[in-house]
């Protein structure tokens, strides 16, 4: 059974300061408002409605926390880049997000979800740069990969991996599809490492 299928909703917080105690391990998920973040979380956790999907991009302006166990959490950050969100809210959120990435001790990795057809937009790059500056590893998931044929998919993946070298940090890029599960195993391998699951399993085998 997947570790992630045990995810349970804990709380919704209006900003970083309302999160639970800064202890244990957490991994944050971030992405543009139409990048398919909620669908990816639902696929990862094998739960159809753990993270609420919305036809209206930018609807979720709360931070949602999902517990895997007492010490491990998935953090669902609000989608960014949606034009109808007032500028004052955008700026406040960007400041709060920067502080979270740089100061949160329990944060062990950042998953950035990007539509495979439009990766590395300005805010995606800014987010990755913040994470790299804070010595955080980044997993970039090229979502909606099912929308491209195999050849085009591979070309986009190679292009994105080449582009990621410019960040000069621990940035891994994989394909992902919430629809058919493409790339789920690669995603889980990275998360297992961040959460210490891989280490736990090695100890059990010894």
UniProtKB/Swiss-Prot annotation:
Please indicate if the UniProt record lists Cell wall biogenesis/degradation as a keyword: no
Annotated EngB-type G domain ranges read 23-197
CDD domains from the xrefs? Answer: YihA_EngB (cd01876)
| Cofactor dependency | Mg(2+)
In this chain, Mg(2+) is annotated as bound at 38, 60
Q: Which residues form a coiled coil?
A: none
Q: Which GO terms describe its molecular function?
A: GTP binding; metal ion binding
Gene Ontology cellular-component terms listed? cytosol
Q: Which UniProt keywords apply?
A: Cell cycle, Cell division, GTP-binding, Magnesium, Metal-binding, Nucleotide-binding, Septation
Q: Which HAMAP family match?
A: GTPase_EngB
Q: Which protein family is named in the record? A: Belongs to the TRAFAC class TrmE-Era-EngA-EngB-Septin-like GTPase superfamily. EngB GTPase family.
PANTHER family assigned to the protein according to its UniProt record, in alphabetical order:
ENGB-TYPE G DOMAIN-CONTAINING PROTEIN (PTHR11649:SF13), MSS1/TRME-RELATED GTP-BINDING PROTEIN (PTHR11649)
Role according to the record: Necessary for normal cell division and for the maintenance of normal septation.
Question: Cross-referenced NCBIfam families, in alphabetical order?
Answer: GTPase_YsxC (TIGR03598)
Q: What is this protein called?
A: Probable GTP-binding protein EngB
